Amino acid sequence: MGVDQPLGDNFITTSLDSLVNWARKSSIWPMTFGLACCAIEMMATGASHNDLDRFGIIFRASPRQSDCIIIAGTVTKKMLPVIKTVYEQMPEPKWVVAMGACACSGGVFDTYSVVQGIDTALPVDVYIPGCPPRPEALLYGLLKLQDKIMKDKNSFGSTIGLGERLESAA
């Protein structure tokens, strides 16, 4: 959030979009959706060593309290409708993080029952590669999501998230 013009000791001016984006970036509440071994690394990221709370990132168990979903692990075709339902229950704006090679591209499982990347079903905002990715990689991906949120131009008064905005532009 940049300072456009100082008015004195106790005042600064900025755009409303910058203020709203700063608040959104500073309070990401991800819904954890651990499907395989990447979930272990996601739990390690949430431990005290990395301290996600200092970035305003607090894991939530309910989709109605979350604004981000982390898909971690292998997505099967049988699990895909459940993931879509959870995604639809999240309030706007909402973001999707694909964690691990399986969530990003299907990984080593090139079979009929595995979805070859969650981006075929949901609009992914951040991809975190690796098998499994280290906790530092997930932390870096969440910080990149914060950067992406800060660059959002139409957040105030808008009822759509970044992923849906990208879909409607295509």
UniProtKB/Swiss-Prot annotation:
Reported cofactor(s): [4Fe-4S] cluster
Catalytic activity: a quinone + NADH + 5 H(+)(in) = a quinol + NAD(+) + 4 H(+)(out)
First-level EC class: translocase
Signal peptide start-end: none
Cofactor comment text: Binds 1 [4Fe-4S] cluster.
Keywords: 4Fe-4S, Cell inner membrane, Cell membrane, Iron, Iron-sulfur, Membrane, Metal-binding, NAD, Quinone, Translocase, Transport, Ubiquinone
GO biological process: aerobic respiration; electron transport coupled proton transport
PANTHER family with a match to the protein in the record: NADH DEHYDROGENASE, NADH DEHYDROGENASE [UBIQUINONE] IRON-SULFUR PROTEIN 7, MITOCHONDRIAL
Protein family: Belongs to the complex I 20 kDa subunit family.
Protein name: NADH-quinone oxidoreductase subunit B
Species whose genome carries this gene: Geobacter sulfurreducens (strain ATCC 51573 / DSM 12127 / PCA)
